[in-house]
Amino acid sequence: MSLSNKLSIRDLNLKDKRVLIRVDFNVPMKDGAITNNNRIVQALPTVKYALDNGASAVILMSHLGRPNGEAVAKYSLKPVAAEVEKLLGKPVEFLNDCVGPDVEKACQSAKDGKVILLENLRFHIEEEGSAKVDGQKVKADAEAIKKFRASLTTLADIYINDAFGTAHRAHSSMVGVDLSQRAAGFLMQKELEYFAKALENPSRPFLAILGGAKVSDKIQLIENMLDKVNALIICGGMAFTFKKTLDNVKIGKSLFDEPGSKLVQNLVKKAAEKNVKIVFPVDFITADKFAPDASTGYATDDDGIPDGWQGLDCGERSNKLFREEILKSKTIVWNGPSGVFEFDAFSSGTKAVLDAVINATKEGATTIIIGGGDTATAALKWGAEGQVSHISTGGGASLELLEGKELPGVTALSSKN
């Protein structure tokens, strides 16, 4: 799967065409009101581009929450239609469903730059292909899925996917719209461009910073990165599994991943064979409990972490080692925070890595990608947007790309040639 060879909205003639855009309007809501409209704001450039380039209609489709394959009022996209209308400065027609004769008729007759938002795709089990009933997974009927996808396909002439955050899901709206031109919107295109730069043609030295809790959860990520990078920083909770297994460092009641510990020797051996330098933390900020109000302590590798205490962040000596490695690098991919940054007392390690990454950008590092999920949350918490090349919008999707997997939503896009 080449990331750099996918059709983009800029490659298409949109004049007098109905354009169906899969957006990600999965915004946080409270009591029917949107609490953060960032995802809607991010989708607007693609919508505006289609309108400015003569599209006869723009039809928007999205999911919201997890309604489990049935209509649930609190997951309706109706409040989102009002927000899109406000931000776009033009009327948005909201339809009470996303498929079926009424929806098909409304979309097929839309003209003069009309904007339509369909109801939540996940109100139908056919979107995800399954639902949970009484705790059991129930699969959607194969014929019903075909019919659902066929109905979506009749709504427009051109399909645009701008929902990178869902690109790792083989859902109907991601892979089942059977139009001849299927292209990436601006958000999707930006994600693909940056990941292509890092994974297909990186400037070197190439560094991966990998945090997170369990080695066993990140095994594919570490394996794939070892084939690509020059250096690897291992931080976060999974560092303790490496430290205890390799050097018998005392880790107190810090996170220890028993299944993951069995993989450590092979990973280190592979790194040596590939000439990849691994940098581990050497000191830690410790806590007597996992809580924001925990008492804090300090421990080094030599002394180890006392019984009853756990490491929740990397210490200053570790941060200095990480910074030195970061400032040497031209391409950096960061997935997984350095510590429990959600608790102020244990946030300085993650902040130090972020500061170093921003510094590296200023000093000429060409491509810096901060993976989605917790790492992106940390970066946004400290206002890093615009200070590094790219903060990914997709947690699961970015992780799967870094693991070397193909993303169904990307594979489904048309290639340029």
Swiss-Prot record:
Keyword Metal-binding: yes
Binding site for ADP: G212, G236, F341
GO BP, sorted A to Z: gluconeogenesis; glycolytic process
CDD domains to which the protein is assigned, alphabetical: Phosphoglycerate_kinase
Residues that bind (2R)-3-phosphoglycerate: V23, D24, F25, N26, N38, R39, S62, H63, G65, R66, L121, R122, H168, R169
Binding site residues for AMP: A213, K214, K218, G237, G311, E342
EC number annotated for this UniProt entry: 2.7.2.3
Catalytic reaction(s) noted: (2R)-3-phosphoglycerate + ATP = (2R)-3-phospho-glyceroyl phosphate + ADP
Protein name: Phosphoglycerate kinase 1
Taxonomy of the source species: Eukaryota, Fungi, Fungi incertae sedis, Mucoromycota, Mucoromycotina
Gene name in the database record: PGK1
